[in-house]
C-alpha cells in the first residue's frame, strides 16, 4: 500500500488535524516507510509460535474469595452526612 498527499490530507481531515502543505509532503515518505515496516512484519513466518501476552511467565496471584462486611461500618458511616441505626439516612424521594 502506498500513501500519497491526498491520503494524508484525508487522514488529517478525519482526525481533525490541521496540516500545512509542507507537513503533508514530509509525512508522505514517513508514512510509506511505516507501512513498509508493517509489510515486513507480515512476511515473518510465525507458524508454530504460540501467541503470548508477555515475554515472561506471569501468574496471577489470587486471594481467597471470602464474603466479608469489612468490619469497618463505623468508619464508613462516619463519612455520611446522616446515619441512623447503622445505615445511611437519606431524604424521602417518593411519597
UniProtKB/Swiss-Prot annotation:
Keyword set, alphabetical order: ATP-binding, Ligase, Nucleotide-binding, Protein biosynthesis
UniProt keyword ATP-binding, yes or no: yes
Catalytic activity: L-glutamyl-tRNA(Gln) + L-glutamine + ATP + H2O = L-glutaminyl-tRNA(Gln) + L-glutamate + ADP + phosphate + H(+); L-aspartyl-tRNA(Asn) + L-glutamine + ATP + H2O = L-asparaginyl-tRNA(Asn) + L-glutamate + ADP + phosphate + 2 H(+)
An annotated GO BP: glutaminyl-tRNAGln biosynthesis via transamidation
Coiled coil: none
Enzyme superclass (EC): ligase
GO MF terms held by the record: asparaginyl-tRNA synthase (glutamine-hydrolyzing) activity; ATP binding; glutaminyl-tRNA synthase (glutamine-hydrolyzing) activity
InterPro entries: Asp/Glu-ADT_sf_sub_c (IPR036113), GatC (IPR003837)
UniProt keyword annotation of Ligase present: yes
EC number: 6.3.5.-
Pfam families in UniProt: GatC
Complexes and interactors: Heterotrimer of A, B and C subunits.
Function: Allows the formation of correctly charged Asn-tRNA(Asn) or Gln-tRNA(Gln) through the transamidation of misacylated Asp-tRNA(Asn) or Glu-tRNA(Gln) in organisms which lack either or both of asparaginyl-tRNA or glutaminyl-tRNA synthetases. The reaction takes place in the presence of glutamine and ATP through an activated phospho-Asp-tRNA(Asn) or phospho-Glu-tRNA(Gln).
Family: Belongs to the GatC family.
Name recorded for this polypeptide: Aspartyl/glutamyl-tRNA(Asn/Gln) amidotransferase subunit C
Gene giving rise to this polypeptide: gatC
Amino acid at each position: 500500500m502506498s500513501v500519497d498527499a491526498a491520503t494524508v490530507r484525508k487522514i488529517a481531515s478525519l482526525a481533525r488535524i490541521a496540516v500545512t502543505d509542507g507537513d503533508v509532503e514530509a509525512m508522505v515518505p514517513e508514512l510509506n516507510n511505516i507501512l513498509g515496516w508493517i509489510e515486513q512484519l507480515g512476511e515473518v513466518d510465525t507458524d508454530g509460535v504460540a501467541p503470548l501476552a508477555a515475554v515472561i511467565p506471569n501468574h496471577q496471584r489470587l486471594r481467597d474469595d471470602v464474603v466479608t462486611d469489612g468490619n469497618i461500618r463505623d468508619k464508613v458511616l462516619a463519612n455520611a452526612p446522616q446515619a441512623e441505626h447503622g445505615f445511611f439516612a437519606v431524604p424521602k424521594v417518593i411519597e
